[in-house]
Amino acid sequence: MKKMIDLFAGCGGLSLGMEQAGFSVVFANEINSSLFETYLYNRNLPKNSYFIGDINDLNNNIDKYKELFIDIDLVCGGPPCQGFSMANRQRILDDPRNNLYKAYLFFLKEIQPKFFIMENVKGMANKINEILENFQEFLGKDYSYSYSLLNAKDFGLPQNRERFFIIGNKLGVNTDNIFNNIRNVAIKKRFVLKDAIFDLPKLKPNNVKNNPKIENSDIGFFEIKYKYPYSEYANFINNGKKINKLYNHKNRYNNDRDIEIFGLLPQGANSLHKSIEHIMPYKNRNHIFKDKYFKLNENEVCKTITSHMKFDCNMYIHPNQPRGLSPREAARIQTFPDDYIFKGTPNNWYAQIGNAVPVKLAELIGKEIIKYL
């Protein structure tokens, strides 16, 4: 197995995809302990093989882990960055908001992996020339780099999710070829939303407040035995593995007005639709309420799953049930397998899932990189 390190690991979507591609995680870092609870629950990492805390603290104590960091094949990371807009004229490295980005570069410099991946929002493309200069400043001329915007839907996955990737290596590999190979992968099927979620049990609206621990057949369960009907999509995300339990498929609370709106809106409609104008008479305030509600279309890919779902799922209304998507449905869209279990509170599940890299997109990237190792 090829050795990889995952920084800013979150709940483990990127790691899982790389593991499915043939990499083995030898070390992971995440500052958010609730996110990392899920990461650790789903894999067996020895205690000295992870660090829960700020990457800057990891860098300050890097000698403690040096034995683990020998001959690393791949380092992955998506450092949170807020200074990538065109409007920001400050140098990236001088912007205090980007200290985690700087820490990621420092880690690469210290570890010198054969390959690295940096993944981030598409706004990173606005500063790509400066970013590549930063890489050269930290890593010297031993590394070559390529970059690309990749959208999950272009690879047959049921989500419109565009992210920016930089791949670098010190083996002399032309990374342009890696991105070309990724883009030219033969797509066996292009999945849409109904493929991803329609085989899961139906849930009824939940209008009872303050009941996050309650579970039943109406609003769903944290964990329950379940016999899945055959689904080509489930077979795809589960890699053919048969799973006999359903996890994290639980409906959240909504007030009666929301539930009524969920039922009235047709698929593909938002808050401006005439079907709810008697409930939301805001014709002169369209710019405020346009993005308040949206009912997903079963025959299209899903809009981008985001961590905002931890607050509400009003922009992610199920196509034919008067409710928002459940965490398991969101995880399905992010191509997590059905036996990947999310820990913490239901709201926290949404945050974990929304911040993840789609597992099958990560696997696709990993399979191309591992060919050169």
Predicted regions and their residues:
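A generic secondary-structure signal marking the coil-to-beta-strand transition
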Residues: 71-73, 162-164, 189, 193, ...
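Core alpha/beta nucleotide-donor-binding catalytic domains of modification enzymes
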Residues: 2-112, 122-126, 133
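C-terminal target-recognition/interaction regions appended to catalytic cores
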Residues: 222-373
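Hydrophobic alpha-helical packing residues
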Residues: 18, 139-140, 369
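Class I S-adenosyl-L-methionine
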Residues: 64-69, 82, 86-281
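Short alpha-helical segments and helix-capping/turn motifs at coil-helix boundaries
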Residues: 55, 60-63, 149-153, 288-291
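Short clusters of hydrophobic/aromatic residues that line enzyme substrate/ligand-binding pockets
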Residues: 58, 84, 157, 181, ...
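Short Gly/aromatic-enriched secondary-structure transition segments
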Residues: 42, 181-186, 319-323
